[in-house]
């Protein structure tokens, strides 16, 4: 690895501000980013850790709307009782992602932002007609997922 500036954001607003510095990348579970950095496929100037931001964690169900925070682990998605009732297929799918280590560290936000063609969440979110909410806007899943490893995320989101 190489030198990188590490920041633990105290809020979503601080994370967004730090994301503007240099070639910063968000970090939560690190299941894709850290291996990419180790093999020098990614070389961010700054890592902005959002893994402990409560605003980005957890599952909320209100009527027919399910909201899952970007820093919510696959394990937490798979074991949330409210989600198991509201959308059992999504909870079950999350329980089958990777191995226990990946399920306990990997996050739904990281999986979605990476848009790996082998990942489960993109297809599930497309099928559900989901909306991805960033710090700046709301994006329909069919507009968010552009192609292999490509999303509709813009700089600073």
Question: Which residue stretches match the model-derived regions?
Answer:
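C-terminal structural segment of proteins
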Residues: 1-157
């Amino acid at each position: 690895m190489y030198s990188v500036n590490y920041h633990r954001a105290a809020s979503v607003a601080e994370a967004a501000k730090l994301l503007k510095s240099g070639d910063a990348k968000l970090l939560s579970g690190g299941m894709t980013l850290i291996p990419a950095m180790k093999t020098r496929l990614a070389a961010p100037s700054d890592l902005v850790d959002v893994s402990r931001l409560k605003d980005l964690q957890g599952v909320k169900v209100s009527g027919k709307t399910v909201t899952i925070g970007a820093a919510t682990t696959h394990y937490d998605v798979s074991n949330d009782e409210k989600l198991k009732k509201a959308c059992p297929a999504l909870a079950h799918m999350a329980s089958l992602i990777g191995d226990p280590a990946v399920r306990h560290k990997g996050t739904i936000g990281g999986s979605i932002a990476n848009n790996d063609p082998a990942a489960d969440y993109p297809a599930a979110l497309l099928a559900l007609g989901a909306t991805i909410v960033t710090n700046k806007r709301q994006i329909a899943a069919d507009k968010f997922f552009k192609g292999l490893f490509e999303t509709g995320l813009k700089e600073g989101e």
